[in-house]
Amino acid sequence: METRINTVIPRDRIGALIGSEGTVKDRIERAFDVRMTVNSESGVIELLPNEGNNDPVSLLKAKDVVAAIGKGFAPEKAFILFDDDKVLDVLDLRDLFGRSETDIQRVKGRIIGSEGKTRRMIEEMTDANISVYGHTIGMIGGYDAVSTAREAAEMLIKGKQHATVYKFLRIKRREAKKKMTLELWEKPPG
């Protein structure tokens, strides 16, 4: 039996997934050694391994890239997930607010901030990429970066002041720099 993974993305993101003359779709298929079938009517994407590809992780990674594009990331940002050390995390605001469109819009506004300032600050302080699209908040980056970005987003969702979140991000940034410096000094030669 052939392994396959199906996922669904919004129809308005199909064009971004396929790309100009199929370039994005081709790049994903080549990077993960998979075949991708796109149903542009329903938004269903089917991923199958190419013959000889026995790596089940490749299907899961390809699914993450497709999901990232579906969550509003530009393909170039989604391609960050080609790196095994990068992860995608998605916060679904419907899980917190149900179908209350006003609450979802309010929280999206808090996370984006005035002229995108808050989203930009979270991205700069964590080195994660953030997409606020539909009823979701998507985050791409290293595990620690995405974890910190998620924590900052959750603080904003709970109603914390922006200044409190910025302070939290500065502290986390300082801790990350200190950790990186210590790791550089502790690495054994060779």
Stretches with model-predicted labels:
Residues 1-190:
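RNA-contacting regions in translation and RNA-metabolism proteins
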